[in-house]
């Protein structure tokens, strides 16, 4: 055999079998950076139709986690696929840089502003801290193979961006959507600031559940409303009963709300002589009366009379422990789902309470300070923290005989997303974007219908949120944030009449010096001494959701890279329906009257292999850095693309191992292609399609069909579909059939002969397509493959430096449907081959043959199938990987044959008695008959020193 080894076309390539991605990828990244890959893409696509995926900014604090990796890789895959589809698709990564988490990190080191540092110095420290965090995260994202304008990202703290955020506020005000009000807002006592809806998360909490009695001022007048039978009006005090889980809000109670159309009952609670308890009467919703009595442990009671809630309007009841009385008011928010049907109303501590309070002119009492402590003038509770005061309030109610019942109650309660601590509703002076003042809610709901939501359920989700959302509280009482750069009248608090002009002047200052320019500004510099005497600066800062929400203007509309185009796609986690998607929508409609995006695509959260949330305490956290250091970024990227990311996305060591296995299959397929292109020059060696061996044309046709499906999947953001089709192509169509069949021809045919060159032509065309399909997902590996491919593209042109600057390969072709050996023909041949393989395997197990090339088989088939098999002539044996394959026509199973899965096909398997060729390993009768070449067959002699064998079909 050694004498003939040099006559074989052995595969050879510099593309290694093992990826060693963790070591190789950083080297490739350096090359991408040194040779300005991103800039090369921009040059190549300049002037093409644009596709803009606008990056939702991650927060500049902490290391990136696996959810960040999922998000950034998804974006990168989509952008690279759009680039290959010919779009100019720039990617400008961004960061959210203001806000409390950064303040807290700076406070840990330097203390609160005003102590060791002035406010200005504190802001500078925040800026420096955020910049450092951006750099750390940036390196992590780059390591994932994400291409973008990393040298010039957008940061919400960039002076130009801060200026544009202020301009955005001006536009909102100009369009009459800005509102100043004293309203209850979500308030975190740890932050000392208002929270937006998106900053609130719900967790289970145990609260004191209390039923409280409010005693009627005019008992006879109240009882008269219930139409009791004469002489059966009952006896004892008359009280309306409320239920609440926030006893601390009782000092702010200013009414009891009932529903106008609900039926209410006057209940007589009978005297309990054994416990020295007098009789008394209670008012509750009729539907809930039994529940209330059961809860309070009242066994002896009966109903005295009924009335509608509307009949009780404005009847007055004594506050449980203060010396004033409160009215009964009507509210649509009152239900009979729980409680008593009579709702404790504190307009300073609840949105619905506030609305009812406005309607009835109730006092908006807020006895609680920003730190959650009752103000000094709060009777009975001054100086106590509200949550600690719950027990004190309960005791006070007991002392006043107003507590009907008390027990611990577990329920879902709003918490601060940063501190994970319970929050309160607290009325404070705040700035709002009004949802209804100028029709913003209705316009936003209309615009939602003009957007494509992927998955479709995203539309109903965000519609429900916009329909039900309160006014957007955009003001914060913080130090590190973009200022609400407005001037208000010192007495009336009205906006300055020249607000539009003043906003632009402030924005220009901030553009030069950053947000500190606002705090350093003397109002007289902008408006003159006379106006400055009457107007003052607003010292609140903007909600960071406003910062990121207006990037459709501050970034997309402003960066020259986008050429004035608006965003085609926003892509974030599904939690952003209540976050960035909504803040972007509301601000864009408020500013421009239209949605900021054409499509919104969401992905789910990452969970572990058992579906559990990632948690350090559980020990199931998968860090992107650990994966790239161990397996490489391409494995992580393939994992992302292989998942159905629209739902929860599972990751674990085992799941990543499966991705690594899939990666190896794809890599080995690519390596086979490259290794067998050894010695192939596309400029001189390409075979014309019509002259190619039929099976080679079939293989190129399979690639053409795969490419159509893959591009369609990429266009639909169906990355799971891309990887499935890619795996099917590599493992099934190529690995299990085509590549298996062509090894004999590729290795043993005459070097440079038609049989070999036809095969290499197919391999060349297929790998040209394959490397592009891979590029968006396995970017590093695609780049590696690209650099091992022939320098020429076969059209007189040299290959681009990078696969990412080109477009999908357009040189594929397939078999025509009217050809005898069309796709349907080869599909049937594969079925026959599969059936034969099963029988060969049995023959191997039974030791009839050693390997398939030792087999001589006869295929007994019906006339139709036999005719198809015979079209392959002597080349049928190459398809079946046997040394001999004969076809016989039969309608019944011959003696000694075996039935197969293919209808009408029976097969006889025998061991060949012919000698084995040392070169091709086929068992052929003429081995040993050719002088000078006694060890090989005649076919091999022809391929070594003759014209070379002729192959037409396989």
UniProtKB/Swiss-Prot annotation:
InterPro entries: aa-tRNA-synth_I_CS, aa-tRNA-synth_Ia, Anticodon_Ile_BEm, Ile-tRNA-ligase, Ile-tRNA-ligase_type1, Ile-tRNA_ligase, M/V/L/I-tRNA-synth_anticd-bd, Rossmann-like_a/b/a_fold. It catalyses: tRNA(Ile) + L-isoleucine + ATP = L-isoleucyl-tRNA(Ile) + AMP + diphosphate. Transmembrane segments: none annotated. The keyword Protein biosynthesis applies. Belongs to the class-I aminoacyl-tRNA synthetase family. IleS type 1 subfamily. Monomer. Catalyzes the attachment of isoleucine to tRNA(Ile). As IleRS can inadvertently accommodate and process structurally similar amino acids such as valine, to avoid such errors it has two additional distinct tRNA(Ile)-dependent editing activities. One activity is designated as 'pretransfer' editing and involves the hydrolysis of activated Val-AMP. The other activity is designated 'posttransfer' editing and involves deacylation of mischarged Val-tRNA(Ile). NCBIfam families: ileS. This is Isoleucine--tRNA ligase. It comes from Photobacterium profundum (strain SS9). The gene is ileS.
